Regions:
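Active-site loop-to-helix "anion-binding N-cap" substructures in soluble metabolic enzymes
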Residues: 2-185
Length: 185
């Protein structure tokens, strides 16, 4: 998908970085890999380096409306959990309140995104809780752009940014499905 219009300068024809685009005031879907080791006895973080690794990008997007998407483990595993703890830790690390939304692309998530103002950040729930992302109803690679997750979230977003390189080898809607729908950086 060619990126045109006010997001980027007209002469940009190469791979884009955040330095190349103007995202201030825009709604950005931000896919991260914050899958972290958790203490099995209490769910506490044993290492939060993956959360720390996204602080720079979050600061770069400080004038945007940032919708954070991530996962923690897989269904059935002892460390599979919602993203509330990740949201809390990330809020403390960045020194800004990030709103946890216990939803991925349903009405609660859509309302939270629509109510955002520039500078706000929301952290959606574990994307692997959505059946199209992981599990029996996981969509095929060729159908990811028409999945519910991509269709709904791309309708309220201006761009997609990924720092989920640790999971980039996987086919799932939140990793590869947005490429045909909205500008991806």
């Amino acid at each position: 998908m060619a990126i045109e219009g006010p997001l980027v300068p007209r002469n940009v024809t190469t791979v884009l970085s955040l330095d190349d685009v103007r995202l201030a005031g825009r709604t950005v879907l931000y896919r991260v890999d914050v899958n972290s080791p958790l203490d099995p006895s209490n769910g506490a973080f044993l290492d939060d380096s993956r959360l720390r690794s996204i602080l720079g990008t979050l600061r770069d997007l400080s004038d945007s409306k940032v919708v954070i998407m991530g996962h923690q483990s897989r269904p059935g595993k002892i460390d599979f959990t919602d993203m509330a703890g990740h949201c809390d830790r990330l809020s403390r690390l960045i020194g800004q309140q990030i709103r946890f939304v216990g939803d991925i692309c349903g009405d609660q998530a859509m309302t939270a995104i629509e109510e955002m103002h520039p500078g706000d950040k929301v952290f959606l729930d574990n994307v692997r809780m959505h059946p199209e992302e992981y599990g029996e109803k996981k969509v095929k690679a060729e159908d990811e752009s028409s999945s519910e997750v991509v269709t709904r979230l791309s309708s309220v977003a201006d761009a997609y940014v990924t720092d989920a390189f640790g999971a980039a080898h996987r086919n799932s809607p939140t990793l590869t499905g947005f490429t045909e729908e909205i500008p991806c950086i």
